[in-house]
């Protein structure tokens, strides 16, 4: 494990060991590695509702980043499916926005279904667009709240 600031970042090997030893992660695995990544991230995000402390959010986003790092190491040259890595990094710096982002990630499951049925990769676009939409919504809200 690598320690940075207040975060503990799992190496891809450590993340793989965690996934293999954890029923929740194993239950999240689907037909392809890309679905494993998204379902694992989805399960992690849902877990935060039961313990929404900052420490838990840090741990959850560390695990999410690690799960996705495993995917990146195994999917060389398939960058389009790995867009959620940036989401995990963004979440670490924006804990206050965590739950709204969880909603956008949850919305990505429709794109995942489309990917499994058609083989067309709308998955990474959907998740990335969801976070972009959230950031845009937050910026629009700030603009509306500025005094005239």
Predicted regions and their residues:
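A short, Lys/Arg-rich alpha-helix, primarily the initiator
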Residues: 1-28, 32, 69-95
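Short, basic-rich loop-to-helix N-cap that marks the start of a DNA-contacting helix
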Residues: 48-62, 119-133
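Short alpha-helical "recognition helix" segments of helix-turn-helix
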Residues: 28-34, 100-105
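DNA-binding alpha-helical recognition surfaces that contact promoter or target DNA
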Residues: 17, 39, 43, 86-89, ...
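Short C-terminal boundary/hinge segments that cap the last helix of small helical domains
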Residues: 62-82, 135-148
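Recognition helix of helix-turn-helix/homeodomain-like DNA-binding domains
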Residues: 35-52, 107-123
């Amino acid at each position: 494990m690598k320690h940075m600031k207040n975060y503990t970042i799992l190496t891809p090997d450590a993340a793989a060991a965690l996934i293999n030893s954890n029923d929740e992660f194993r239950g999240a695995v689907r037909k392809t590695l890309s679905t494993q990544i998204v379902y694992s991230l989805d399960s992690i995000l849902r877990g935060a509702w039961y313990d929404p402390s900052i420490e838990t959010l840090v741990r959850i986003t560390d695990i999410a980043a690690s799960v996705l790092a495993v995917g990146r190491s195994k999917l060389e040259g398939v960058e389009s499916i790995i867009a959620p890595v940036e989401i995990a990094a963004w979440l670490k710096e924006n804990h206050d926005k965590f739950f709204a982002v969880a909603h956008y990630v949850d919305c990505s499951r429709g794109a995942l279904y489309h990917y499994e049925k058609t083989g067309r990769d709308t998955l990474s676009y959907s998740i990335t667009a969801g976070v972009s939409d959230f950031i845009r919504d937050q910026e629009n809200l700030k603009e509306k709240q500025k005094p005239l």
